[in-house]
Amino acid sequence: MSRIGKQPVTVPSGVDVTIDGQNVSVKGPKGTLTLDVAEPIAVTRDDDGAIVVTRPNDERRNRSLHGLSRTLIANLVTGVTEGYTTKMEIFGVGYRVVAKGSNLEFALGYSHPVLITAPEGVTFAVETPTKFSISGIDKQKVGQIAANIRRLRKSDPYKGKGIRYEGEQIRRKVGKTGK
């Protein structure tokens, strides 16, 4: 039995969960999220109102999907109650970010500014010209946008210039030495 999959997902008050076959819909104070659970996995509610994820047998694929499905449902519940936020930093002379409506405009040393559009359900907040955050209820969307932005200018191992997650440590390299 999967250690993660066998744990029930507790549903806090103010959150409404609808299970329709393989479709799980979670509605909370921040919005609504839905998930299509993979075919052999069964999702039910127990007497306490918690969500229970079960698998029909111990095939390798079913074991893999068991813990994954439970975690994805738990992420839906957390998303509609608390939401997800990723904070990012920009390092480098002249590198900065500016909010343009619901979009972000980056100056990253290229010959042109880079514009990132916020997808539906994701918001950007610029604290300083070198610090910004990405917020939303869908963990996958927030993480994917953060990864896409980080990829615009990855941190350089020699000078440390670039975009990185807040608190991320970049492994620095020593440059060439002269004779």
Curated annotation (Swiss-Prot):
Gene3D superfamilies: Ribosomal protein L6, alpha-beta domain (3.90.930.12)
Alphabetical GO biological process terms: cytoplasmic translation
Protein's UniProt keywords contain Ribonucleoprotein: yes
Keyword Cell membrane attached: no
InterPro entries, per the entry: Ribosomal_uL6-like, Ribosomal_uL6-like_a/b-dom_sf, Ribosomal_uL6_a/b-dom, Ribosomal_uL6_bac-type, Ribosomal_uL6_CS
A molecular function GO annotation: structural constituent of ribosome
Lineage top rank: taxon: Bacteria
One Pfam family from the record: Ribosomal_L6
PROSITE patterns named in the record: RIBOSOMAL_L6_1
Record's keyword terms, sorted: Ribonucleoprotein, Ribosomal protein, RNA-binding, rRNA-binding
Any single GO CC term annotated in Swiss-Prot or TrEMBL for this entry: cytosolic large ribosomal subunit
Subunit architecture: Part of the 50S ribosomal subunit.
Similarity section: Belongs to the universal ribosomal protein uL6 family.
HAMAP family in UniProt: Ribosomal_uL6_B (MF_01365_B)
Task performed by this protein: This protein binds to the 23S rRNA, and is important in its secondary structure. It is located near the subunit interface in the base of the L7/L12 stalk, and near the tRNA binding site of the peptidyltransferase center.
Name of this chain's protein: Large ribosomal subunit protein uL6
The species this protein was found in: Mycolicibacterium vanbaalenii (strain DSM 7251 / JCM 13017 / BCRC 16820 / KCTC 9966 / NRRL B-24157 / PYR-1)
Name of encoding gene: rplF
